[in-house]
């Protein structure tokens, strides 16, 4: 039951007093419904009206809702965009928006209508990366459904899986109990104040994606889709052993040490000087399913970075990250809370980066990467569960690495299972990836890179030099 509606239709306003206001607020402008990747992206501009309290969006199949009580309510609030993903394929959905005020008056203007057709036609997006091309931007080419996209544009955020990625508060049972405002994590999606450093962890939710990655000559071919196209497409980031998960979560911040466990909280210094085993164990204390970033989850993020910016040099595409070597004090988390889902500066090395809501995706401090090891003979060992220091139970795959590597990445293996594991390095950061790799056998991995490594850090930085396990 809509209690607010019941009260207001009986003449009781927001203050609990009888009101004689019968005039609804102005209509929204530019109401649009666009089908994208098995969902519908609804967008509009809210009216500049002091009487405006929110917008209610109704959905029907076959015809437009005749009133705000007709059909299914898919959204109610003050945002200007909503992704409707509770839909079926092969249907035409009719949407109608109704603005309302604090006294229950609804605007029923016919201008606030739109329709979207959802077809069972799987779209495959992708990029090709020519590793022989030293230019990190022109080395990347959009292919498939991605042809014609503008790198870095908001249009990309309407494509699956970008349109389903969201910041949330996650409880100890692994349940998202509140969605945060993508533009400002200090607020909930409904506009209330969010508690970012108390009971729940601040996490980013990532939906399942099917990925195919192979190398032909010097060209890495990456394709992804919202469903399994054929047996060559894998959803390894969403696998836990043999079980597929619909989503996975990563901490929005570098982990901090609180109450005897690792937390993803705003306003705290990152936990440092701990081994990967200590990090792993303290993360698990949060509840069932908690752990560290895994290799295949990070590969998922790397692929989306390339797709978003059409570049394999993250510092050139997004920002330097916190790489100011004159200040050795780790910055507290949350300084990018009000900076949306993406942020970076290409001139100021004291500014943090943020990608898909992940603060310090690189820079500030490196992040342990679980589920990957190199054997004494440099075979690659990977797993999607039961992570440990010895690679017990991990899958082994041969690599093109014969001994340790230390330098700037020029070529990677470029397969679905080996991802961007480097296979060739050079002495200069100029061209291609621009990130450093330090690969040694039997040691735990870190990714991203720390502030002390300056221009070496980035989305493809990889380090297994240090032996603390």
Regions found by a protein language model. Name each.
Residues 1-23:
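Enriched but not universal
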Residues 17-53, 89, 103-119:
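Pro/Thr/Ser/Gly-rich low-complexity, intrinsically disordered linker/stalk tracts
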Residues 45-70:
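Solvent-exposed loop/turn segments flanking beta-strands in beta-repeat/beta-sandwich domains
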Residues 78-83:
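Short S/T/G- and acidic-enriched coil/turn segments that sit immediately N-terminal to beta-strands
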Residues 84-106:
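Beta-strand-rich modules
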Residues 119-231:
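N-terminal module-boundary/linker segments of secreted carbohydrate-active enzymes
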Residues 123-125, 297-299, 320-338, 345-348, ...:
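C-terminal, surface-exposed recognition/capping segments
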Residues 193, 197-200, 227-361, 365:
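Short aromatic-cysteine micro-motif
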């Amino acid at each position: 039951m809509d209690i607010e509606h019941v009260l207001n239709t009986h003449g009781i306003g927001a203050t609990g007093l009888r009101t004689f206001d019968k005039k609804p607020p102005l209509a929204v402008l530019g109401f649009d419904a666009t089908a994208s990747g098995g969902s519908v992206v609804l967008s509009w501009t809210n009216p500049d009206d002091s009487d405006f309290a929110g917008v209610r969006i109704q959905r029907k199949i076959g015809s437009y809702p005749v009133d705000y009580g007709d059909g299914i309510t898919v959204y109610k609030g003050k945002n200007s965009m909503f992704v409707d993903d509770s839909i079926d394929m092969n249907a035409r959905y009719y949407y109608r928006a109704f603005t309302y005020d604090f006294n229950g008056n609804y605007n029923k203007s016919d201008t606030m209508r739109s329709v979207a057709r959802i077809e069972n036609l799987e779209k495959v997006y992708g990029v090709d990366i020519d590793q022989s091309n030293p230019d990190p931007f022109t080395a990347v080419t959009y292919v498939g459904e991605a042809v014609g996209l503008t790198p870095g544009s908001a249009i990309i955020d309407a494509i699956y899986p970008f349109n389903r990625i969201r910041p949330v508060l996650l409880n100890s049972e692994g349940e998202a109990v509140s969605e945060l405002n993508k533009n400002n994590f200090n607020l909930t999606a409904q506009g209330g104040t969010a508690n970012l450093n108390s009971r729940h962890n601040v996490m980013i939710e990532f939906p399942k994606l099917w990925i195919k990655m192979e190398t032909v000559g010097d060209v890495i071919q990456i394709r992804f889709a919202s469903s399994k196209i054929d047996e060559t497409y894998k959803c390894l980031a969403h696998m836990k052993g043999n079980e597929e998960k619909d989503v996975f979560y990563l901490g929005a911040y570098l982990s901090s040490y609180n109450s005897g466990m690792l937390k993803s909280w705003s306003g705290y210094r990152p936990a440092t000087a701990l081994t990967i085993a200590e990090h792993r164990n303290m993360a698990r204390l949060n509840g069932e399913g908690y752990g560290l970033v895994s290799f295949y989850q990070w590969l998922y993020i790397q692929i989306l970075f390339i797709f978003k910016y059409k570049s394999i040099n993250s510092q050139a595409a997004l920002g330097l990250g916190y790489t100011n070597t004159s200040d050795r004090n780790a910055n507290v988390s949350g300084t990018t809370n009000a900076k949306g889902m993406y942020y970076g500066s290409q001139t100021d090395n004291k500014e943090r980066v943020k990608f898909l809501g992940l603060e310090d995706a690189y820079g500030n401090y490196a992040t342990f990467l679980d589920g990957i090891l190199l054997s004494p003979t440099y075979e690659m060992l990977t797993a999607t569960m039961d992570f440990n220091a010895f690679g017990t139970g991990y899958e082994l795959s041969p690599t093109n690495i014969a001994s340790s590597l230390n330098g700037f990445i020029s070529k990677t293996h470029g397969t679905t299972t080996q991802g961007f594991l480097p296979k060739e390095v050079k002495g200069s950061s100029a061209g291609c990836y621009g990130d450093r790799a330090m690969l040694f056998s039997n040691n735990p991995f870190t990714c991203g890179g720390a502030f002390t490594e300056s221009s070496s850090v980035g989305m493809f930085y990889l380090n297994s030099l240090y032996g603390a396990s």
